[in-house]
């Protein structure tokens, strides 16, 4: 997480006067290489999106990792005008999504390395709620959720809110969920008292206690 945060901060610092989307991709690729992080960053133009809309997906492949190939791929889905220069706020929003997606997948990589790249389960064939109940996903989402809560509430305030975890799943500030990942994750289950969500809450609490906010990009 510290290294990914450093990458994102360096890209933002090198874009103080604004940068185009293509320039940001170039800077990101260069920074990740300089930090010896092996991942691909791709862009996919989706004309169904408006000119300011985008989202980031990332994927980890245990087989590629085992074969010493690039194990993580980050894909930015967008419909950006290539000539538009982004300001600091837009750059920060973009890099935040890059940071979150990359940290999530590097957690999966650590999980995979720990079990010597043995595939844990056939995620593609599972119903989505069963996929989310996978221990690997619970652990990775706990990190992602803890990061979002630290951004929106601060670490210690977030820890206090954990006693009302069910309410936290739906909590919004300024019209935005304090943790979009938590809202989306909990929404996949019929009840907020589901055993998977109780386990997730415990994992999030532990992650909040351990996380160093100096290494959360924001």
Per-segment meaning from a language model:
Residues 108, 112-116, 146-149:
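Glycine-rich, acidic and aromatic/proline-enriched surface loops and short helix-turn segments
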Residues 130-133, 144-218:
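Long, well-structured alpha-helical subdomains associated
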């Amino acid at each position: 997480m510290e290294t990914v945060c450093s990458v994102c901060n360096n890209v933002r610092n090198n874009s103080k006067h604004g940068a185009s989307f293509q320039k940001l991709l170039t800077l990101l690729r260069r920074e990740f290489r300089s930090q010896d992080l092996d991942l691909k960053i791709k862009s996919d133009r989706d004309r169904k999106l408006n000119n300011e809309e985008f989202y980031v997906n990332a994927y980890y492949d245990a087989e590629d990792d085992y074969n010493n190939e690039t194990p993580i791929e980050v894909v930015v889905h967008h419909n950006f005008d290539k000539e538009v220069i982004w300001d600091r706020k837009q750059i920060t929003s973009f890099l935040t999504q890059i940071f979150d997606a990359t940290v999530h997948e590097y957690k999966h990589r650590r999980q995979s390395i720990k079990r010597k790249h043995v595939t844990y389960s056939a995620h593609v064939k599972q119903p989505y709620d069963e996929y989310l109940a996978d221990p690997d996903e619970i652990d990775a989402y706990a990190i992602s959720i803890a990061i979002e809560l630290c951004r929106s509430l601060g670490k210690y305030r977030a820890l206090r809110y954990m006693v009302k975890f069910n309410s936290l799943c739906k909590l919004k500030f300024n019209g935005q969920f304090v943790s979009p990942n938590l809202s989306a994750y909990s929404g996949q289950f019929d009840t907020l008292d589901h055993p998977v969500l109780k386990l997730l809450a415990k994992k999030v609490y532990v992650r909040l206690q351990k996380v160093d906010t100096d290494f959360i990009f924001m």
